[in-house]
Amino acid sequence: ALADEDWDYISLQQASQLSGLYDTYQPYLHALIAYIRVHVPTKAKIVFHQTWAYAQNSTRAGYENYGKNQMKMYRAIVRASEQAMRTEPIALLIPSGTAIQNARTSSYGDTMNRDGFHLDLLYGRYTAACTWFAVLFRRKVEGNPYAPKGMTPQQVQISQWAADAAARHPYEVTKIKL
């Protein structure tokens, strides 16, 4: 796959249940980046996708790693992604985990997941997509007219605000008052 295209970006992420445990990143993250640099032109930027904490009521295996506590999992993910950005030659962080946590402070509440860990197919995925947009294009997504069919204007606004706030402050939760 790496040789198939002239990539601008190559994204990496840790498995969600391990995403807050930095010890599970190494030596694999370092080795993956080294492999990419050998097989892909240096112009391709490596980005790291920060995953999200599970829903409070998740029964997903691995949630025990965080005492089945959403904020504990979120804080661990933030620490691990911060450490990855500090110790590896990664160009950009896509803070989807922070965007999802931001959205959870809104009227969405803890409804961002459809099954306790995968994102809701509509506003959960849209919030993550908005985060990718804000970071990759280095501009606010607020006001972008695109939204999936079935979203209300308020849902669009919450998702866009959550993503923009995460792009500005990738390691802290911003309260969304909608």
Language-model features: locations:
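Conserved catalytic region of serine esterases and O-acyltransferases that act on ester linkages
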Residues: M112, G116-L119, Y123-R125, A129-L178
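Alpha-helical cap/lid subdomain in secreted, periplasmic
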Residues: L2-L122, A134, G143
